[in-house]
Each structure stands twice: as C-alpha cells, then as structure tokens.
Amino acid sequence: MSGWIITAAAVLLIGVAVLFLLSVTARVPGNLRVRDGRLAPCPASPNCVCSQADDSEHWIAPLTVNGDVGGAMARLRTVVLETPRTVVTEETAVYLRVEFRSAIFRFVDDAEFWLEPEIRRIHLRSCSRAGHSDLGVNRQRAEWIRRAFTLVDRPASRSPAGSFGDATGDVPTAAETH
C-alpha cells in the first residue's frame, strides 16, 4: 500500500513540476499585433478565441462600441483591469494588449483588443501561451469582458428635461416675488 502512495505522489509531483516548467518557459508569441487589418489567427488547439477567426470553434463576436468612440479603449482598459492578475503590456489609441495569469501555475494568456473606430467595433483575440486546452477559460473571460464593457459603454444620455421646453416660465420674476 505504501509503495502505491509513494508512486502516486511521485507522479503527481512530476506532473506539477512539468506544469510549472511549461508556465515559466512559455514566451510571448511573435505574431501578436495587427497586421494587414487582422489579428493573428488562432492555432489549431482549442485554447484560443478571435473575432476574426474563420472557423466556429475559435470565433467569438467582436465588441460593439455604443458610446463615445474616442474613449472606448479607456473604458475597455478599465474593464479588463478588473480581471485579477492582469497586466497591460502595450497600449495605443486603438490597440490594447494584456497578459492574464492563472492563479496557481501562473499560466499566461495573451489578449489583444483592436478598435476599428469607423465601424465602431473592437476585435479581440485571447490565446493561451502553453498547453492544448484551457477548458474554455479564454472564451469565458472574453464573454465576461463583453458583458462588462456593454455596461460601461453607454451613449451619453440626454436629460428628459430637454423635452419639456424652456423652464423659465416656471421661475417667478423679481416683480412677482415682492
């Protein structure tokens, strides 16, 4: 019985060591950024989603900008940074790249967001650096970001008071108050 426990513990320890090694040796992919109007394609593995993917396994809808286009990336940045263990690694007026780290093994997922202001759309790509499957984490996170962005990305609302006309008739003049 004790031989079985020692073997199981050794296998578990080796597995943890391999996962840790994968985590610390994974490098930033060289194909990130927008090239010719497109984010990098997803690899064949299921650990990636992209709004510009050509296949349904990897495709995810882009974000729609409903509010001010000029402030869209700042609003998105605020939403993205609500995610734990997130670091912004690159940022321009129309592009945001972040790294998400997992809690236990510190695996890194690279995410990119690219604003096309003329069509009020933010394309996104999120992909794990290491491993094959992410158990749907990139898709779930991207959908959470979409929901949160939709909540903060509202057009500036107009006050309903503007539809009632000039309110000066309701204010008594100096002669009426004396």
Question: Language-model features: where?
Answer:
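Ser/Thr-rich, low-complexity intrinsically disordered terminal regions
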Residues: 4-8, 18-178
